[in-house]
Amino acid sequence: SATTTISETVTFATTSNTTASIFNDSKLKRLELDVYDANNTLVRHTLYYLILQEGTGTTTTIADSVYVNYKGQLLDLSVFDETTTQSTSNWIDLIGNIVTNKPSGTIRGFREGVAQLRASATGLTNNSDGTLKAPTDGGVGVFFIPSGLGYFNNSQAKIPAYSPLIFTVRLIATRRADHDHDGKPSINEIVRNEYGVITYPDCDANKDTSYLPDYLDADCK
């Protein structure tokens, strides 16, 4: 498989009198998002992000399946995860399955960040040796994710608890996911408010005991 690197360079902090911090960059954007805490109280967190390249293709939603190249780092810039090849494993189901907690669902900050990007208009191409080549016209962004939009107090293999995260993402392709294959995109079967809190309608909640939200229930269209 072809090796892929995220080569965009970003200055994260002031390192000299002539190097400005990214947090003073006028292009830095912010997204306010609410999260329920352990007491079921909404707490607001801020996702900061920088769009390095908007992308030329399809817009993305938080309920899509996306093909991405990414690099995940801690604040000391140590890398805890990254894509190194082009393969089917680069496809990620952003929202996943809330009933089974399907592993493919992503952390809030990653999901909301990728949704700010457009995909490539050209897509992957085949090299003569059979490997895949990623296009260069997909959206590229850097996302600064507070722990409340990440893993919070749950440590991961290379991520200590309460760690803010940095993700650099290149979006190659996006698909409007239809998790229950009922012909209606999943994004149209959930409700997201202005601060990113999702509610999951259940059209037949009083009729059966399946306890499936509409986006996972083919009987709800």
What is the role of each PLM region?
Residues 1-221:
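Cross-family detector of peptidyl-prolyl cis-trans isomerase
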